[in-house]
């Protein structure tokens, strides 16, 4: 959809920024769902970043357990120097719905520390993002 909006707005003569395809959210509607944006660990290392990586399995998430659909995980790749979020990768139930929060953190140049401080409803699947951010900071609660 974003590409279409940019194309039409440019045809209308509006000043529109280029799309950032690295940070473009990616969603695969499969069972389980897969969603991601940004760099993978390998890509980030290849670009010379020193990394902090936070992982959190949905097995540790109360909402996923209550739903009986707890396979999968959230993985956050961040710059070890300042914690800038470089990429987020998720596999599990409804993860395509969870990507917006992490993507917004990247757009606003946020860090894993800031993402970790974000308050989430409890219980919710989105708490897995917070937990992965906490894990990147070596402060995971439910691990």
Task: List each model region and its residues.
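Acidic, glycine-rich loop-and-beta core segments that form the ion-binding/anion-interacting portion
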Residues: 1
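Flexible, glycine-rich terminal cap/loop adjacent to redox cofactors
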Residues: 12-13, 17, 24, 29-143
């Amino acid at each position: 959809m974003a590409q279409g909006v940019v194309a039409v707005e440019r045809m209308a003569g509006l000043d529109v920024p280029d799309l950032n395809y690295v940070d473009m959210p990616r969603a695969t509607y499969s069972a389980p769902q897969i969603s991601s944006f940004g760099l993978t660990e390998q890509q980030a290392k290849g670009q010379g970043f020193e990394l902090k990586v936070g992982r959190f399995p949905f097995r540790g998430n109360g909402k996923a357990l209550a739903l009986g659909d707890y396979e999968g995980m959230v993985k956050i790749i961040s710059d070890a120097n300042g914690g800038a979020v470089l990429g987020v990768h998720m596999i599990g139930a409804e993860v395509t719905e969870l990507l917006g929060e992490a993507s917004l953190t990247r757009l606003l140049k946020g860090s894993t520390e800031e993402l970790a401080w974000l308050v989430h409803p409890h219980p919710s699947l989105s708490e897995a993002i917070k937990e992965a951010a906490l894990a990147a900071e070596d402060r995971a609660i439910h691990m």
